[in-house]
Amino acid sequence: MPFKGLVVQVADPQTLDKIIDKTLDTVGKSREQIFEISEQSRNEYVSLEQELQEVRMKVAEIIDQSDRAEVHARFARNRLAEVSKQFHRYSNEEIRKVYEQANELQVKLALLQQEEQQLRDRRDAIERRLLNLKDTIERAEELVGQMTVVYNFLTGDLRQVGEALEDAREKQAFGLQIIQAQEEERRKLSREIHDGPAQMMANVLLRSELVERIYHDKGIDEALKEIRDLRKMVKSSLAEVRRIIYDLRRMALDDLGLIPTLKKYVKTFEEHTGIFVDFKHIGKGERFPEHVEIALFRLVQEALQNTRKHAKASHVHVKIEEQKTKFTVVIKDNGKGFDQTEKKEGSFGLVGMKERVNMLKGQLVIRTKPNDGTTIIISIPITTEE
């Protein structure tokens, strides 16, 4: 039975905008606070890494001193035992000197061992703190990314509250997917920079501060050797930065098309990595929808980068075959392979590849086992529409 006189009040768009603005302010402030925690943790991480390097050097020095002190103390004890057995052959003054020397060396050895234990304890404490900081940084970055997704989304289509509900839902789902994909790409790029050039430059900074100490302690030859090592690290860091920049570009995909662009990329990949790539193309090399060409290029790129980072392979075979209704891509390496039931370091890249293939309504099959290489088979329908 209908309820007569029942009135449902709907908030006007201005009221909803005020609510969204208040929510945005709260989300924005929370995001900044988490970012500050992340930065503070990162700064402490760098500082502790430097201290850990110094403590490890001191431990090595103390161990060396302890070993030498142990030899001297043992010699002094043997000398004291010899004098004690034949004390009638030595004067009281000689016996006293031998005893004092043995006692002094034993005390010195005990102090060195105590200092070594303290340094080891400090080293272990720093390593534990670094693990906790790393976990804090990763969690903070993930939270910032999630809040950014929410923030960007709230400043987007949700303000258009006057549109039809179904249309809004579709835009919401699509917009959220795009924002999530963007944030995932940013997190991936952030990880690559942090684990690659940023880590290398942090090591360069730490080691550069040791050059002066090495010069004073070990002389100019050792200092010059350290500088040469630093130069190699800087070159490696520069090469890694160039690789990241190179991977971010689609190169001449729009102008050349998929196959010529892949050939160019494969050649550059070989030059940068020393891994031989046997590239084979079967088909006419026609142009296809942009989103299909971009996806195939990124899939091959991601597969080769996974090979470079994790497979320890020397040869890779890449075959692309154009058929009437689909593209088939096969990437096979002679690397170490892996157990698919175990979560591996490179699984993130494979997950991204699977998601990209699913978006194109394709199929991805991985065949691998430990010590037997990896084969990736990708099938993409040519008729896929944007």
Swiss-Prot record:
It is found in: Cytoplasm. InterPro entries: DegS, HATPase_C_sf, His_kinase_dom, Sensor_HK_TwoCompSys, Sig_transdc_His_kin_sub3_dim/P, Sig_transdc_His_kinase_DegS. Residues 188-384 form the Histidine kinase domain. It catalyses: ATP + protein L-histidine = ADP + protein N-phospho-L-histidine. Pfam families: DegS, HATPase_c, HisKA_3. GO terms for cellular component: cytoplasm; membrane. The modification Phosphohistidine is found at residue 194. GO terms for molecular function: ATP binding; phosphoprotein phosphatase activity; phosphorelay sensor kinase activity; protein dimerization activity. The keyword ATP-binding applies. Autophosphorylated. Keywords: ATP-binding, Cytoplasm, Hydrolase, Kinase, Nucleotide-binding, Phosphoprotein, Protein phosphatase, Transferase, Two-component regulatory system. It comes from the Bacteria. Its EC number is 2.7.13.3, 3.1.3.-. SMART domains: HATPase_c. Member of the two-component regulatory system DegS/DegU, which plays an important role in the transition growth phase. Acts as both a protein kinase that undergoes autophosphorylation and subsequently transfers the phosphate to DegU, and a protein phosphatase that dephosphorylates phospho-DegU. This is Signal transduction histidine-protein kinase/phosphatase DegS. It comes from Brevibacillus brevis (Bacillus brevis). The lineage of its organism: Bacteria, Bacillati, Bacillota, Bacilli, Bacillales. The gene is degS.
